C-alpha cells in the first residue's frame, strides 16, 4: 500500500501539467522555445457562436500569471494567445472577426494609427481553412512585436507593441468577445466553457459548412 501511494504521488506533477477544457487537454505550462521563455497558463475558455456552437478554445499564456487585465496588456514581457479550433473555420473569417472586435475596442485615433498593421495581419491569415483540432497562436516577442503562427508555421511578424496591446483588448479589454470568456482567461471563477454575451455577438465567427 505504501509503495502504491508513493507511485501515485510521483505521478501528481505529470497529472497537473494539463487542464481539460471541453475534453481538450490544454497545457498548464509551455516550455522555453526559440525567442520565447517558458510561459504559464493564465486561463482558458471556449468561445461560442451565439452561445451554442463552439468555435475555439482560447488559452492565455504569460511569464507571470495575473488576473489584472491592465497588467496583462501593459507589461512588456512574452505572451501567447493560443487557439485550438473546435470546428472548421476559414482563416479570413477569423481575421474579419478580429478586425470588427478591434474597431469596437479602439478609439478612432488608435484605429487610424494601427490600421496599416491591422491590414497586414489580416492578410497574413490568408484564405485557408482551419480545421477542428488545428492550433494557432498570436505571440508577443518583447523588443520585436506580434508573431502569427498557424499549424506550427510562422506566417509573419509585425513590429512594435501597440498592435499586440490592441489585440489583447479583443479578449480582455472593455468590450471583450464575452464577459465570461474574459473572466476565465484572466484566471477568474467563470466557467471554462464561457459563452458569448448576447450584446457581443456582432464579433462572432461564422463556421464553415
Residue ranges, per PLM feature:
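Cysteine/selenocysteine-centered motifs that mediate thiol-based redox chemistry or coordinate metal-sulfur cofactors
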Residues: 180-209
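Short strand-turn-strand beta-turns centered on an Asx-Gly dipeptide
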Residues: 150-152
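Flexible glycine-rich active-site/ligand-binding loops centered on an Asp-His dyad
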Residues: 155-181
Amino acid at each position: 500500500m505504501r509503495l502504491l501511494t508513493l507511485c501515485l504521488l510521483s505521478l501528481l506533477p505529470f497529472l497537473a501539467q494539463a487542464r481539460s477544457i471541453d475534453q481538450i487537454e490544454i497545457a498548464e505550462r509551455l516550455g522555453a522555445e526559440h525567442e520565447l521563455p517558458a510561459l504559464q497558463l493564465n486561463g482558458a475558455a471556449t468561445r461560442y457562436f451565439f452561445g451554442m456552437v463552439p468555435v475555439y478554445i482560447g488559452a492565455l499564456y504569460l511569464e507571470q500569471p495575473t488576473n489584472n487585465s491592465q497588467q496583462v496588456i501593459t507589461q512588456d514581457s512574452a505572451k501567447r494567445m493560443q487557439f485550438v479550433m473546435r470546428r472548421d473555420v476559414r482563416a479570413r473569417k477569423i481575421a474579419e472577426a478580429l478586425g470588427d472586435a478591434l474597431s469596437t475596442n479602439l478609439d478612432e485615433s488608435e484605429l487610424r494609427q494601427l490600421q496599416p498593421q491591422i491590414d497586414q495581419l489580416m492578410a497574413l491569415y490568408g484564405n485557408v481553412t482551419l480545421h477542428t483540432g488545428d492550433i494557432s497562436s498570436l505571440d508577443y516577442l518583447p523588443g520585436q512585436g506580434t508573431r502569427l503562427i498557424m499549424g506550427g508555421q510562422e506566417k509573419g511578424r509585425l513590429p512594435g507593441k501597440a498592435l499586440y496591446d490592441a489585440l489583447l483588448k479583443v479578449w480582455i479589454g472593455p468590450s471583450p468577445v464575452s464577459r465570461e470568456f474574459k473572466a476565465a482567461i484572466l484566471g477568474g471563477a467563470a466557467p471554462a466553457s464561457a459563452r458569448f454575451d448576447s450584446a457581443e455577438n456582432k464579433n462572432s465567427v461564422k463556421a464553415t459548412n
